[in-house]
Amino acid sequence: MKSYFILNCLNQQKIADSLYRYYIELTAHKKIKNFWNNLDREEIKNYFSIQNLELKKWFDQMELRVRDMSFTIYNEEIQTNIHTDAPPVIAKINFPVLNTQDTYNVWYDSAGKEIDRVECIKPIVLRSDIPHTVEIGSRAKFPRIQFSFCFYKDPINLLM
């Protein structure tokens, strides 16, 4: 099974802009302290109730129904380490929103040796059940914002 699969998204910028607006709304009155930030059911419902939402249309085209939604923040104060996501999720979709150029998803084998990497400039299906992290290049800007989506049916078929 592949570590990732780059997805074609004709409306990537429009979707990224919509996610960024929602991120601003979600974080307007709270300080973010963690890399990983889960949205609750009400927040997910509110986002997907937006009229003519391009992200919903895109997921509908792939026959994917969102179960969980979160965002990640990477900046001077908030980073992440090599980790494996909690079961039962094997595959999820990461969607780049802001400052993802020169940032990379990197995967490792059980011995800690790098086995794969991809720059985070396009939406990807990523394998989250093996050790992985985010690495930042010297030209990266902060804050780096990316949204992550889990589904009722994992898009594992795209990693085969």
Please place each PLM-identified region on the residue numbering.
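Non-heme Fe(II)/2-oxoglutarate
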Residues: M1-R65, S70
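Short beta-strand-to-loop capping motifs
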Residues: L7-N11, V97, F149-K153
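Short linear sequence elements within intrinsically disordered, low-complexity coil regions
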Residues: C9-L10, A28, Q79, K113, ...
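Residues that cap or initiate secondary-structure elements
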Residues: N11-Q13, E77-I78, P88, Q101, ...
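Catalytic core of non-heme Fe(II) oxygenases with the double-stranded beta-helix
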Residues: L64-I130
